[in-house]
């Protein structure tokens, strides 16, 4: 079977996009190859090999389209904001569909608006949980659990550049508090309107960006840290 693969990215969060809308057998045929294709060392691609994951555009009985995502390790997350923006743009360009798209995800139906090369997504309402603390060596790490349809743990730090993300990310994600793992955001509030963030994503590792993570950081900032309703979140990818 021949499969056309398109690579797209949302501020550095890169994905392979595959059209499984017209031929549903494409999805099952691609599943065994996900880890190989996404490998940063030997995966698909030239300038930057591999990807953070693969997203499939599929038919839906309850929305315009259905999105199924697999992380680089093959796991299937509930939601990803950046890949949703990419797949909405892909669907619009491929099928010349409406500029307003309803896309089914594991976290529910999300509405996407396409305006030229810009795509916005209504992420829905966050769910907050009580402040938690995790022991790491001789330190207690406070964190704010938030669900944006997928799980996040937001950690406030003084300097995101010096955080050992590749150590603390998997350590927090593997804590019994999060039986299904968690995406971990390390944030510093620069001002009431600016947050700097780095992110460790379950099933991938540190990534250049995370849309749902940026939303989780923004709502934690507003609810607990004194930021304003409108805030700019700066990630490694932009």
Where does each model-flagged region fall?
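A glycine-rich beta-to-alpha transition motif near the start of alpha/beta enzyme domains, typified by
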Residues: 1-116, 154-238
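Glycine-rich beta-alpha junction loops
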Residues: 9-11, 127, 148-152
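Short, solvent-exposed secondary-structure boundary/capping segments
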Residues: 117-124
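Beta-strand scaffold of nucleotide-dependent catalytic cores
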Residues: 121, 144, 210
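Active-site glycine-rich loop that binds ribose-phosphate moieties when present
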Residues: 125-143, 167
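Internal active-site segments that recognize and position negatively charged phosphoryl groups
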Residues: 135-137, 141-162
């Amino acid at each position: 079977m021949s499969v056309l693969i398109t690579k797209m990215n949302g501020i550095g969060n890169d994905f392979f996009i595959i059209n499984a809308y017209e031929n549903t057998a494409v999805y099952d045929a691609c599943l065994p190859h996900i880890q190989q294709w996404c490998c940063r060392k030997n995966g698909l691609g030239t300038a930057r090999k591999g990807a953070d994951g693969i997203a499939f555009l599929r038919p839906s009985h309850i929305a315009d389209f259905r999105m199924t995502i697999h992380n680089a390790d093959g796991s299937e997350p509930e939601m990803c904001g950046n890949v949703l923006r990419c797949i909405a743009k892909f669907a619009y360009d491929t099928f010349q569909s409406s500029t307003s798209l309803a896309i089914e995800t594991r976290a529910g139906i999300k509405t996407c608006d396409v305006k030229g090369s810009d795509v916005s997504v209504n992420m829905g309402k966050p769910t907050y949980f009580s402040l938690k603390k995790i022991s790491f060596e001789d330190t207690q790490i406070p964190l704010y659990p938030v669900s944006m349809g997928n799980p996040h743990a937001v950690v406030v730090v003084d300097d995101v550049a010096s955080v050992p993300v590749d150590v603390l990310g998997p350590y927090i994600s593997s804590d019994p508090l999060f039986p299904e793992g968690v995406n971990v955001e390390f944030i510093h509030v620069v001002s009431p309107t600016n947050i700097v963030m780095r992110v460790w994503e379950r099933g991938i590792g540190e990534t250049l960006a995370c849309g749902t993570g940026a939303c989780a950081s923004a709502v934690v900032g507003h609810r607990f840290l004194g930021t304003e309703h409108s805030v700019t979140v700066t990630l490694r990818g932009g």
